[in-house]
């Protein structure tokens, strides 16, 4: 938040939390900004390795999870540049409260999607998503420090632009194709 010339205060946009201000020994500082924190949702397709990412306010909620799941399934504005869409047969998640919520389970049931909740302490079960998070952090978010982000919509537009670039140009080591090339081979 910064002061304007007329004395009013306005938000200065999204920014990284300072580690010395927000850490485990200062929980009240974290609680104050809880609803303003930006949460990243990352999903992948197992066969192609395609990565999807979106950002949300409000934490890990069933509403945010359902919105992200629908975002992953729906056709994007330009399906030639971003062909990733469709209803999966199965979704694999960790046992978080949003992931096991009635809202998400009902959405999946209505779409005939099997929900596989991984057992706690089995990190290999979600290794692909962990690697996708690493890729998002190093290949996309690391460059955000050079960009002034004004709102979450701008952040999501940048994320979509990056996803089209990354999924469309970077070859996956497992199958030797770009993620979108592999996606387009799925029948």
Q: What residue spans do the PLM features occupy?
A:
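Short catalytic-loop micro-motif centered on adjacent basic/acidic residues
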Residues: 55, 90-94
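A generic secondary-structure signal for well-formed alpha-helical elements
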Residues: 72-80, 95, 111, 115, ...
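A general structural motif
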Residues: 86-88
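RNase H-like two-metal-ion nuclease catalytic core shared by retroviral integrases
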Residues: 93-94, 101-111, 115-141, 153-156, ...
């Amino acid at each position: 938040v910064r002061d304007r010339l007329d004395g009013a205060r306005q938000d200065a946009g999204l920014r990284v939390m300072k580690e010395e201000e927000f850490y485990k020994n200062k929980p009240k500082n974290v609680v104050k900004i809880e609803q303003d924190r930006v949460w990243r949702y990352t999903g992948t397709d197992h066969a192609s390795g395609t990565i999807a990412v979106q950002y949300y306010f409000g934490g890990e909620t069933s509403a945010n999870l359902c919105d992200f799941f629908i975002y992953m399934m729906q056709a994007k504005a330009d399906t030639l540049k971003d062909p990733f869409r469709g209803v999966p047969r199965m979704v694999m998640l960790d046992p978080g409260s949003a992931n096991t919520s009635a809202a998400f389970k009902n959405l999946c049931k209505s779409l005939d999607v099997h929900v596989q909740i991984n057992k706690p302490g089995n990190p290999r079960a979600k290794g692909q998503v962990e690697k996708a998070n690493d890729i998002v952090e190093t290949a996309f978010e690391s460059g955000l420090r050079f960009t002034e982000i004004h709102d979450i919509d701008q952040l999501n537009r940048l994320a979509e632009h990056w996803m089209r670039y990354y999924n469309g140009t970077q070859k996956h080591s497992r199958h030797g194709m770009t993620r979108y090339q592999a996606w387009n081979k799925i029948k």
